[in-house]
Amino acid sequence: MEVSIFDGIEPDPSVETVMKGADAMMKFQPDWIVAIGGGSPIDAAKAMWIKYEYPDCTFEDMCKVFGIPELRKKAHFCAVSSTSGTATEVTAFSIITDYNKGIKYPIADFEITPDVAIVDPELAETMPKKLVAHTGMDAMTHAIEAYVSTANCDYTDPLAIHAIEMIMKDLTASYNGDMEARDRMHNAQCLAGMAFSNALLGIVHSMAHKTGAAFADYGAHIIHGAANAMYLPKVIAFNAKDETAKKRYGVIVDYMGIADKNASDDDKVSALITYLRKMNDELNIPHCIKNYGADSYPVENGFVPENVFLERLHDIAVNAIGDACTGSNPRQPSVEEMEKLLKCCYYDTEVDF
């Protein structure tokens, strides 16, 4: 079997990396593309695959939601995941960063769902603790957002709920070095991916996509999983103003067993928010952007200056509203509400609107 290796994919892969990889594919002309690693290399390979199959396709064309032409005319795709969070090995999504604009763009189309996914828990056993924390909370966010998404259904709900139950039991243990828990987390994140690839996501991801690289000129990124972990409790509080979403959060809490089943839905939502914030503490993840250090750990003064955040707030909010994940959120925010929500995520203030 003749092979060619393309490596060196950076975290949060860039448009430029995608184009270089696509050039390498066009020279080698593979029948199969095998992407090995975490979310970044697999996501990058998905975008390269599109460009390989359609050389005239621009990055802007790729970003048109469910607008990718039929693939597999040149190659099939196999994904081998080595981290326990993105589940990109089973999803219709890829996240690519345009560093010139400081924006992460989701490519969303069922055409880019891999033909084969190899989910081997042993590959995740060497993950560093920080990666365990961030990818694990990414998976938790996938499952919760999928369950309350407007596109949820009878086929996705069991996957989402079981993933939540598994992550609740195993993530902190995995973080603290329990290898059996880490093995189970690898399966849990895949279940969460199967749920959200069909039920879609919500504005936690919209906000994470649009803040992740927005402050890269200040020397760091807001790592995707950490962003999800910080924003998820705030978005739950925002979405719970919608009665349907509030009831579904209540069902999640019933399965988790973290509140009395006879408690009100409002009390159950509060219990869920409290539980997730406690998880963030256990995983050494900050509660807000203001306290997000350049190394992703909690600090008194984070790397994003307040004046810079406020200066860029409106544009980030507009971009988040336009993100592919916003349409399936259970409560549709206005630009003004998105700005207020982002402020709550910066200062760690209560969501009361």
What are these language model-derived features?
Residues 16-23, 27-122:
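Glycine/threonine-rich beta-strand-loop-alpha-helix active-site module
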Residues 151-159, 174-184, 199-204, 222-225, ...:
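Flexible, glycine/charged-enriched surface loops at secondary-structure junctions
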